């Protein structure tokens, strides 16, 4: 019955969590597109994490498509380990990466060269305490070399802060379809963490509680859409995206 109207209060949906649940083919993407279009009409800011490359051709004004990249300089060691796909139970390899992934590496002009150099120091160390991790250090060397080849279009230490590519008042579609599930989770967690921090700073400034110069990007609420949210916010275990989305 086309005479039955269904209306959505945009102010309410941008101020709380919203789940769009339905079986395959029942119109979830169409509803997302419609909501996005309506928010776009009032110059709102939308961010869609597009896991299946479904929204990059969205036909609405002010669409900003971003191919998701990860700047390893901005990650913590455990996040970088996930992106490099070091196994969770490879404790010694994880330790090698933590020891090598120093602040000096993050700030180095030649990121990969400096990281490889730090791992190489562990491989060739004469310290008896470090000899026991030598085999794992060799393996981490291989993983880092392999990652530069396999993830060349994903890992980019020269891109700066990915947040700079998001535009206020636009529909920002972050294409994460080329990332593995773990990589997408790390990237999503990073964006969500930064967005939460940004909105907190904006809220404090809006109520006149901060004397600092403007240190936020979005003065108005941001509507974030996580496609396949059950993958990144699972019920049975914790993830970076789950933590920051909560």
Each model region followed by its residue ranges:
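Charged, amphipathic alpha-helical linker segments immediately N-terminal to NTP-binding catalytic cores
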Residues: 1-2, 185
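Glycine-rich phosphate-binding loop of nucleotide-binding enzymes
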Residues: 2-70, 241-245
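Loop/turn-to-beta-strand initiation segments
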Residues: 43-47, 168-171, 219-223
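Helical/strand "switch-coupling" subdomains that flank nucleotide/phosphate-binding cores, especially
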Residues: 59-60, 68-172
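Conserved NTP-binding/hydrolysis module of P-loop NTPases
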Residues: 65, 80-84, 189-197
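Flexible beta-alpha connector loops of hexameric P-loop NTPases
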Residues: 65-70, 85-86, 177-183, 230-241
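Conserved P-loop NTPase motor cores
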Residues: 183-246
